[in-house]
Amino acid sequence: MSHSVKIYDTCIGCTQCVRACPLDVLEMVPWDGCKAAQIASSPRTEDCIGCKRCETACPTDFLSIRVYLGAETTRSMGLAY
């Protein structure tokens, strides 16, 4: 994934995305790459409805539904580039 370094470097561990998700798709997991020592993860991508509330809530533009869910899922949701 060509975006991973840029994306992971911008997460500040604020949990805004987790709180914004209406379906609890996201959760915070331990990660040493940021000050908060936690990062947003999406273990339940099959439950994502593509509402983009997580993207809107993110103050650093860390989240991208397209990056998290992959091409096949975003195509089926009509979100592909």
From Swiss-Prot:
Q: Which residues form the 4Fe-4S ferredoxin-type domain?
A: 1-31, 39-68
GO-annotated cellular components = photosystem I; plasma membrane-derived thylakoid membrane
Its domain of life? Bacteria
**Protein's GO biological process:** photosynthetic electron transport in photosystem I
GO MF annotations, alphabetized? 4 iron, 4 sulfur cluster binding; electron transfer activity; metal ion binding; oxidoreductase activity
How are cofactors bound according to the entry's free-text note? Answer: Binds 2 [4Fe-4S] clusters. Cluster 2 is most probably the spectroscopically characterized electron acceptor FA and cluster 1 is most probably FB.
> What protein name is recorded for this chain?
Photosystem I iron-sulfur center
